[in-house]
A protein has these predicted regions:
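An N-terminal boundary/leader segment
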Residues: 1-58, 288, 458-464
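Serine-dependent amide/ester hydrolase catalytic core
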Residues: 15-21, 125, 254, 267, ...
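Acyltransferase
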Residues: 24-31, 61, 271-297, 321-327, ...
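Conserved small-residue hinge/capping positions at short loops/turns
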Residues: 70-93, 119-122, 126, 131, ...
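Short helix-loop capping/hinge segments that flank enzyme active sites or metal/cofactor-binding pockets
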Residues: 74-96, 253-262, 312-366, 418-427
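Short glycine/serine-rich loop segments
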Residues: 106-232, 408-431
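A short helix-breaking turn/cap at a secondary-structure junction
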Residues: 194-277, 281, 300, 444-472
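Glycine-aromatic micro-motifs
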Residues: 421, 447-452, 456-606
Length: 606
């Protein structure tokens, strides 16, 4: 059940979940395949902790027995997690044995993955304390690059990226403070999604720079990465840096798209002519797809990048390990120790001076994006061998951050996408960057670009799946989810029809909602999102209204009803009916019915 299974086996999340739902493959078989591939890959440096196979398969079998299993967006998908993110059943080491601890609960991101049907199989290697873009700074070894073994795997999320690239699992979590979710994606020919700051909770993450940290996603396709993001996205009271941002939906490739490219002479490739040529070919591809390329001044972005390690943000890294630096300095990788120790020497004056300059640079970035939808840059300017990096660890690592270090300081979202495979067997990728909140736009255009390259995914030589057109409504139409009397054939459905509403589909929520019957006359339902694992999937319908009709409809909704964001079983998000929690004291929990229609049918016969 190893690599010889070839292209006929489902490799992407979408294909694996579809096979589980169809019954052509069981979650237990998928887990067994992952473990066999791990054995065949024979690289002990990928995982710091690996779950016992029998235990993981037992969980897969238990999951498959659930009545709602098929509705879960990540039904039976094996997932690995970077070992600076807490996951129950595994120690968290941050690649430093002296720092290791046993978490008492899942990080919020892992909790949401499990609730969506994912099965966590292990914790992956990283540059110690997530400090580095190279993947060689770990006492647990250097993971093999999945494309060319002489190349660095990229970091700091080295194990997570190589695990996806090698086909061991279709989804992993990384982190991204300075490029750790993007550089290793390029070097392993996979997709790396760095969401907007605060979109995925960092509760349960060992910080690198707490104000800049993101949990990131590695996957084989943009659609897979976007699905994983939709499962994890959302505010979290446990994370003071969490932000409640609409995720948005993947849309068709826009009719007009303006992409920013640096002015002539501003790009730096450090003499790598093949990378420079590959970037030029990528720009030609964007033009052929219909994008307009607009030059912008990259120098303010370079200046911002220099602030990350030359400015006070290195003090955040120092705060994480200052006690360990004092008590057991030899337990810290020498390069990591050298970088972080500098944080102790920074002053408050240094900090405020840098913050003032950063604010000015942010204003420049805002003006840049005033007439540009997104930037398109090389993910990294070259690819180094492990031998080169070990001989010159700090300078070459710094070079790899040329196009990544400024991103979180400027509050941008990013999507790293494979662009080409060079003649020398080195993968090349581009990164799309946009202001926070434009994650869906990047996914919408990035998926089309990746598909157009016709590249195989990862290192397995498997073709990309056919690109599925995103669901579309009419121009100026807004989808809305209804769960009660507005359902087809029920008492208030006429309100939607009177506004020329159109039924799009009948589906279910993700499995983290409860449904209540409110003590009103006539009876009304109230749906509420609850803690992961404590709810169920609720039946609903999605209708489409024009924006003006949507406004009229929402304006007429009486308290305690409200419109909020609802996660669907397939991972999408849509606006729909929710209830204010304060009125649920005397309400009846009717979640077990699975929907309002079934509850009302039984009530009518009582």
């Amino acid at each position: 059940m190893g690599a010889e299974m070839g292209a006929e086996q489902p490799e992407t999340i979408a294909a694996i979940v579809a096979a589980h739902r169809a019954g052509t493959l069981t979650p237990a078989q998928t887990l067994a395949r992952s473990y066999q591939r791990i054995r065949d890959h024979n690289d002990p440096a990928v995982f710091i902790s690996l779950r016992d196979e029998k235990d993981a398969i037992a969980e897969a079998e238990k999951l498959a027995a659930r009545a709602d299993a098929a509705s879960l967006p990540l039904y039976g998908v094996p997932v690995a997690v970077k070992d600076n993110i807490d996951a129950l059943g595994f120690p968290t080491t941050a690649a430093c044995p002296a720092f290791s601890y046993t978490p008492t609960h899942d990080s919020t991101a892992v909790e949401r993955l499990r609730a969506a049907g994912a099965i966590i199989i292990g914790k992956t290697n990283l540059d110690q304390f997530a400090t580095g873009l190279v993947g060689v700074r770990s006492p647990y070894g250097i993971p093999k690059n999945s494309i060319r073994e002489d190349l660095i795997p990229g970091g700091s999320s080295s194990g997570s990226a190589t695990a996806v690239g090698a086909g061991l699992v279709p989804l992993t979590l990384g982190t991204d403070t300075a490029g750790s979710g993007r550089v290793p994606a390029m070097l392993n020919n996979i997709v790396g999604l760095k969401p907007s700051l605060g979109m995925i909770s960092t509760a349960g993450l060992v910080p690198a720079c707490r104000t800049l940290d993101c949990i990131s996603v590695f996957a084989l396709t943009v659609d897979d990465a976007a699905l994983a993001l939709s499962v994890m996205a959302g505010p979290d009271q446990a994370d003071p840096f969490s932000r409640d941002r609409p995720l948005g939906a993947i849309t068709p490739f826009p009719a007009t798209l303006r992409l920013g490219v640096p002015r002539n002479g501003q790009l730096i490739f450090f003499g790598d002519r093949k990378a420079e040529a590959a970037y030029g070919e990528a720009l030609k591809r964007w033009t052929a797809l219909g994008a307009t390329l607009v030059e912008f001044d990259l120098e303010p972005f370079y200046e911002t990048a220099r602030l990350l390690y030359e400015g006070p943000w290195v003090a955040e890294r120092y705060l994480v390990i200052k006690n360990l630096l004092a008590s057991a300095p030899d337990s810290i990788h020498p390069v990591t120790r050298e970088i972080t120790a500098a944080g102790a020497r920074l002053t408050a004056a240094d900090t405020f001076s840098a913050l003032y300059r950063l604010q000015g640079l942010r204003k420049i970035a805002e003006r840049t994006f005033a007439n540009i939808d997104a930037l398109v840059l090389p993910t990294a300017q070259t690819a180094y061998t492990t031998a080169q990096v070990l001989a010159n660890p700090i300078e070459l690592n710094s070079r790899l951050g040329t196009y990544t270090n400024f991103v979180n300081l400027l509050d941008l979202c990013g999507l790293a996408v494979p662009a080409s495979m060079r003649a020398d067997g080195v993968p090349f990728g581009i990164t799309l960057l946009a202001p926070a909140g434009r994650d869906a736009l990047l996914a919408s255009i990035g998926r089309v670009f990746h598909a157009d390259t016709k590249l195989t995914v990862g290192a397995k030589g498997v073709a990309q799946p056919a690109l599925t057109p995103p669901a579309t409504g009419g121009i100026d139409e807004i989808p809305i989810a209804v769960v009660g009397a507005h359902l087809s054939g029920m008492a208030l459905n006429g309100e939607l029809k009177a506004l020329n509403g159109k039924l799009i589909e009948a589906t279910r929520t993700a499995a983290d909602y409860k449904l209540y019957a409110l003590p009103t006359t006539p009876p009304k339902p109230g749906m509420l999102r609850v803690e992961a694992g404590k709810g169920s999937a609720i039946e609903l319908e999605i209708w489409s209204l024009s924006s003006s009709a949507f406004g009229k409809f929402v304006n007429a909704i009486p308290a305690p009803m409200a419109i909020g964001t609802i996660r669907l079983a397939d991972g999408r998000s849509v606006k729909g009916f929710l209830v204010e929690p304060a009125v649920l004291g005397e309400a009846r929990d009717i979640t077990a019915y699975g929907g309002w229609r079934k509850y009302m049918a039984e009530a009518a016969t009582a």
